[in-house]
Amino acid sequence: MPHVSTSSHKRPRKLWWLLGFIFFALFAVLQMPAAWLLEKYAPDTPYVQHVSGNLWQGSAIWQFPVSATPLTGAAEWSWQPWHLLLGKLGAEVDISSEQTRLNGQVKVGSSSWQIQNMSGKIAPETLASVVDWQLPNTPIQVNNVSLKRQSAKNSEASSSDRNAAGFREASGQLTWVGGEVGYPSGGKVFYLTMPALRAELSAEQKNNKNLLHVNLINNQDKRLGDLYIDGDNMLDVSLTQRLLENMPEYKGQAPQDTPVVSVRQPLLSGLGAR
């Protein structure tokens, strides 16, 4: 009669105890109050005014100090545990501010963040809080936008690591019906009648840098301009003759697809941030 050692019975039992302890510890961590974690790890953050719930599910009141009156809103999240298999924290997120509503998935890794399937609308009131322009009362529609941004590992990263930082993946569209835009510059307001346009997002590599490319086109798929954002949050703007022909004070002449304005500025400054 075969003899079965008692140690062979103990090993599976120990394994189950270990797995049980791991799941219990994970459950305990997920039930930790989000307010306590914020107080412990980011006590002086200016961006979060109130937080409730826990890591699994909760909500927060946020503000972004872009002007004398900060942009405020709310965010709700629901944790998606299967992203841990990829070494990331992932959650379903709803973001709102006045009439702005966005829904999508947010994933955060040790040196990257990712947005997937973000859709909704950005209200004109929200845009007016961010940029010092006169804008038409029409929202920007966000259609299935996905972004993946890689960060340099640390401030002393090599030049190759810094070049690797930036946008590795991008897709989706922004659409806008357009209208009259007033752009202040040099104490004067310049008016431009924006046509209905579509902004198509993609990731491109230029000069060994990973860039987010925003291709601006009209309803006839004609080119209006290009925006590029790099890993250092620098914005490159290129506008074509076709777009500037909608500005009454513009008298330049060139083939319509020719870029006639090119500007490079920090991201928020380039958007006319308050």
Write out the residue ranges for each language-model feature.
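Hydrophobic membrane-insertion alpha-helices, especially the h-region
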Residues: 10-33
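N-terminal beta-strand/beta-hairpin edge segment
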Residues: 46-133, 138-145
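Non-cytosolic head/periplasmic domains of membrane-anchored proteins
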Residues: 102-198
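N-terminal Lys/Arg-rich, disordered targeting/topogenic segments
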Residues: 1-12
